[in-house]
UniProtKB/Swiss-Prot annotation:
Pfam family, one: Glu_cys_ligase
EC number: 6.3.2.2
Keyword 4Fe-4S: no
Biological process terms in GO annotation: glutathione biosynthetic process
Pathway where this protein functions: Sulfur metabolism; glutathione biosynthesis; glutathione from L-cysteine and L-glutamate: step 1/2
UniProt key word Transcription: no
Family from the record: Belongs to the glutamate--cysteine ligase type 1 family. Type 1 subfamily.
Listed name of the protein: Glutamate--cysteine ligase
Amino acid sequence: MSDLLSRRLALLGAAANLPLLTECLHGIERECLRVDSDGKLALTPHPRALGSTLTHPQITTDYSEALLEFITPTETDVADTLGDLERIHRFASSQLDGEYLWSPSMPCELPDEESIPIARYGNSMIGRLKYVYRKGLALRYGKTMQCIAGIHYNFSLPEKLWPLLRQAEGSELAERDYQSAAYIALIRNFRRYSWLLMYLFGASPALDAGFLRGRPSQLERFDEHTLYLPYATSLRMSDLGYQNNAQAGLTPCYNDLQSYIDSLRKAVSTPYPAYEKIGTKQDGEWVQLNTNVLQIENEYYSSIRPKRVTYTGERPVQALAARGVQYVEVRCLDINPFLPLGIDLDEARFLDAFLLFCAFSDSPLLNGECSDATDNFLAVVKEGRRPGLQLRRRGQPVELKDWASELLERIADTAALLDRARGGEAHAAALAAQRAKVADPELTPSAQVLKVMRERGESFEAFSLRQSREHAEYFRQHPLAADEQARFEQMASASLAEQAELERDQDGDFDTFVAAYQASILGLISN
């Protein structure tokens, strides 16, 4: 164990400080496609019974009208977070008339690009802005890539913990700056070690053959309808997914918060020639918000983000610049198609231990490690289960199995401290489940997907539809209690009323609104 990690764990293990570890906050966002009874993309509008996608706090859409996104409230106990997520699933599933929630991350068989419906958010200024932003995404990356779903895991350490660490370490940084620097250090370590998450939890080794739209790839044919890689863990996170030339040169530096903010500010204010050729309007209709490298900060695709809750009308980068980092959003997690919620308590508890390990361990600047971190991540998502696979650690080759075992050994102390804080041995059990996967790659979700498909003679689509139907049956057999059902129905109707009010109470025209939105970031740059 590193000296810094052991010192910090000892400090937090003191009787007066141990309860702090029960105050970490969690939130989960789960995306999933709506599909029809045959497993094809649902072309129906977002069900009105689910409320307004613009204003509902827990049920919205991501890119497509058919790509649902479920958002839990924050909780200190991740078991409560998963309980929240399950209730959202139960309600949503009960409102889908003959449709299913698609079980894996990679999409079902998709119609042609033109027929994939972009999510709509009504006629308010902000609703129209969200729609135009998505039109821009379609122009830049194509609609097919936008139909990939994932799980986002939001995590924060207790605010009271940072002054404790700062004082113990004699830091001269202001409290807010110390906290931000600590979160950026967590992110650097996440970049170093996130390949481990892809090995343990990657669950997308195969995809529908039509997904590539005829483009050449390294993928092999599993059957007539399915492409795969035999040792892949997460094709979703591989380079066949979300890459584009404009973002290729945009790798925000995680040396400190300011350099991260500066790189995003630059990207949202620097024109990109290919987008300039298109322009923002075609035949008088908006097609993208601007012609810059990024239309908005959230367009930048990354496996983890530093975050701060925004005020109304505030942009993410403004919130970070004004008040520092508040939490991290882990974005690289596949949906486990065997689980009704796509994630379970073992995974969540291990994530807590992993993220605390990243936060408390020594985290030097990445400098020359950046390319190794990227290469390791890509190697694992494409061939993480290959026997003898080697990664690079500090420039030297190391076998994945050896490095993974060492990391789990180091994470064990953090898991043990979490168990001391909460009572029981749940985090140790979650860690043991991951050790078993390192010892036997056949226990990983990616291997299990291929195993079941082979044993049952199923294509990716047939496997996924069967899982989706099984999950629908699970939710049907576990309906919400009447008071919970009523609460969700009330939330849905309140969100529809709120959207209607927004649409009534708006002044000015859309062009002016977009210009003001753009100026908010440009004003930040000039300050």
